[in-house]
Amino acid sequence: GVGFKAGVKDYKLTYYTPDYETLATDILAAFRVXPQPGVPPEEAGAAVAAESSTGTWTTVWTDGLTSLDRYKGRCYHIEPVAGEESQFIAYVAYPLDLFEEGSVTNMFTSIVGNVFGFKALRALRLEDLRIPPAYSKTFQGPPHGIQVERDKLNKYGRPLLGCTIKPKLGLLAKNYGRADYECIRGGLDFTKDDENVNSQPFMRWRDRFLFCAEAIYKAQAETGEIKGHYLNATAGTCEEMIKRAVFARELGVPIVMHDYLTGGFTANTSLAHYCRDNGLLLHIHRAMHAVIDRQKNHGIHFRVLAKALRMSGGDHIHAGTVVGKLEGEREITLGFVDLLRDDFIEKDRSRGIYFTQDWVSLPGVLPVASGGIHVWHMPALTEIFGDDSVLQFGGGTLGHPWXNAPGAVANRVALEACVQARNEGRDLAREGNEVIREASKWSPELAAACEIWKEIIFEFEAMDAL
């Protein structure tokens, strides 16, 4: 072959292109790279670009049958990480044609499928992705989005309230449905299947769906509000998952649920399409996320998983709590909360946002705060997350000394008090405890909740730590 020279080659000759001007259609990635000792950062960055696009370890003669320049990933910028020795941020640009339209699965297979086991790297973390409108427009995205959800539920101007039914495993379907009814009758908008409630011997999915639907209809009739229970449709096969979603639709309930990481992006996208076609809202749980995102120097940051979910489709997704954690993490969390909700998000490194992201018309996702929160956190949660969020109190509802319904009442009263105080111009960050105390004077349910949880106000680590 003309110009074909066999042998192993330096990646950086082909894949490190510091002069490259990124295109509006490129998918851009920011990797945190920790090279092995003796490997220069340019070579490591180029290796990442190569292995996640067209490269292989040696020159192959079939390279001559295509235009590598058109299809290769390019490492176009490298910067050291402040305060970390031998860590670098490598920026890689991928041409759009490397990816199948409308497939988060293919996007991840390409970008993170192979390169993380690469020998020249000690560790590698995908910190952020810039999804160009040319690509995001090939996705349906969330089945409904924030505004349509509010219109379907007829609930405006406040966060929504939820509760995970506990104990998560072992209840019989009828008792489960009863706990569900008590919570939504007391004032919550939603109750939730735990992520590992699928269809176990002690409670098969169909029984649970029936009793929860009964709870929803009874509570709706008594309160005049629209209620829901996140019926977990996650299953062992895609076909079984869709079967469960179909049954939920036949019962006329408003929302189903999916574990998108354990279930997989292909299953999740199928379910999201079904939900849009059939008017079901879709609640997403992120079970398994910490396996991928917890290590600071290896894996994938949750903001990337959140962007992927917005493309694949979901109306709610769990996003940590912020409360009782460090200030810095608060900014990072709010960064990906904005990436979930807003149409246009400016690059802001202090919030971990490496690229300006323009979602154009892709609907937004409601962030869900859950994990170790209770009534004393309500002012902080209202302040931090704003109206477009779901606040979920599992133990913070079911752990009420007077039981489930009063627990739900306490949470609803606390929320309404915080929203009213905020609307009157009071500063929840400063006066939050006072707002809760005032409300508890006329709500015995809230007073009892305040009493039982006063010891642990703000002094614990949230269970949902990133």
UniProtKB/Swiss-Prot annotation:
Post-translational modifications: The disulfide bond which can form in the large chain dimeric partners within the hexadecamer appears to be associated with oxidative stress and protein turnover.
Which residues does this entry mark as bearing N6,N6,N6-trimethyllysine?
5
Catalytic activity reads: 2 (2R)-3-phosphoglycerate + 2 H(+) = D-ribulose 1,5-bisphosphate + CO2 + H2O; D-ribulose 1,5-bisphosphate + O2 = 2-phosphoglycolate + (2R)-3-phosphoglycerate + 2 H(+)
Q: What is its main location?
A: plastid
> How does the cofactor bind to this protein, according to its record?
Binds 1 Mg(2+) ion per subunit.
Pfam families linked = RuBisCO_large, RuBisCO_large_N
The GO annotation for biological process reads: photorespiration; reductive pentose-phosphate cycle
Which Gene Ontology MF annotations are present?
A: magnesium ion binding; monooxygenase activity; ribulose-bisphosphate carboxylase activity
Q: How does it assemble?
A: Heterohexadecamer of 8 large chains and 8 small chains; disulfide-linked. The disulfide link is formed within the large subunit homodimers.
Name of this protein = Ribulose bisphosphate carboxylase large chain
User: Which organism does this sequence originate in?
Assistant: Asarum canadense (Wild ginger)
Which gene name does the record give? Answer: rbcL
